[in-house]
Amino acid sequence: MANAIDTRHYDVIVAPHITEKATLLSENNAVVFKVADKATKPEIKAAVEALFNVKVTKVNTLTQKGKTKRWKGKPYKRTDVKKAVVTLAAGQSIDVTSGI
């Protein structure tokens, strides 16, 4: 768990994703993060373990496709967002709401 913090770890984790569903997942030792589009599961695991000093057991990722919207009659597409659901070991926790 004493992984060295690399500057690339800050590029992998973009922001915590705080929603009602993410709050329900936190009861099962899971935390949801918005991550870089090109980030892989091993990179996400290494970044979370190094930045938050916790043990990660599982990483699930998904890419939420951006919606097509209209502005002044012209269609445009919102950007895609990649999310990672990080499951922590028993007894581990991350408080992502402490800075809010």
UniProtKB/Swiss-Prot annotation:
Gene giving rise to this polypeptide: rplW
Biological function: One of the early assembly proteins it binds 23S rRNA. One of the proteins that surrounds the polypeptide exit tunnel on the outside of the ribosome. Forms the main docking site for trigger factor binding to the ribosome.
NCBIfam families per the UniProt record, alphabetical: PRK05738.1-3 (NF004359), PRK05738.1-5 (NF004360), PRK05738.2-4 (NF004363)
Family: Belongs to the universal ribosomal protein uL23 family.
Record note on quaternary structure: Part of the 50S ribosomal subunit. Contacts protein L29, and trigger factor when it is bound to the ribosome.
One of the protein's GO biological processes: translation
The entry's keywords: Ribonucleoprotein, Ribosomal protein, RNA-binding, rRNA-binding
PANTHER family documented for this protein: 60S RIBOSOMAL PROTEIN L23A
Keyword rRNA processing: no
Protein name: Large ribosomal subunit protein uL23
A GO CC term assigned to this protein in UniProt: ribonucleoprotein complex
Pfam families to which the protein is assigned, alphabetical: Ribosomal_L23
Gene Ontology MF term list: rRNA binding; structural constituent of ribosome
PROSITE patterns: RIBOSOMAL_L23
Annotated InterPro entries: Nucleotide-bd_a/b_plait_sf (IPR012677), Ribosomal_uL23-like (IPR013025), Ribosomal_uL23/eL15/eS24_sf (IPR012678), Ribosomal_uL23_CS (IPR001014)
Residues in the signal sequence: none
